[in-house]
């Protein structure tokens, strides 16, 4: 099924002020034009702002404030298996910041999470300390 993580799901402090709870999210943000970006070739890991820019350019799509951006990761191929929770593509901070700077307020994915898979995050942590 579908669900929405409000900004407060990710922490209690943000650069833009206190993150909103879901009951404080304007409903009209969820009833806007959307574009689907295909990142299904990436595999396990993350994409950054540059890949998002490339996909928007490939589609010749110019994001307007409050547009919705959806990511097709190909995660559905893992439906019904444990890999659904571990083998997907998330977004790094630069991708999220880029979308927010464009005025995007709703980002969606067909993956289990918008974050990088936990295993990927742990591997990066071991590499960088």
Name each region found by the language model.
Residues 1-129:
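Active-/binding-site microenvironments in catalytic and ligand-binding cores
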């Amino acid at each position: 099924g579908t669900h929405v993580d409000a900004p407060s799901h990710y922490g209690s402090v943000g650069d833009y002020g206190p993150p909103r709870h879901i009951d404080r999210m304007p409903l009209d943000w969820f009833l806007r034009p959307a574009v689907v970006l295909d990142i299904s070739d990436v595999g396990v890991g993350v994409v950054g702002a540059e890949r998002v820019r490339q996909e928007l350019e490939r589609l010749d799509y110019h994001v307007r404030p409050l547009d919705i951006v959806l990511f097709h990761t190909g995660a559905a191929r893992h439906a019904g298996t444990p890999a659904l929770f571990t083998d997907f593509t998330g977004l790094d901070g630069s991708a999220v910041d880029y979308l927010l700077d464009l005025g995007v307020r709703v980002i969606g994915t067909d993956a289990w999470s918008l974050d990088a898979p936990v295993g990927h995050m742990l591997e990066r942590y071991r590499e960088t300390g």
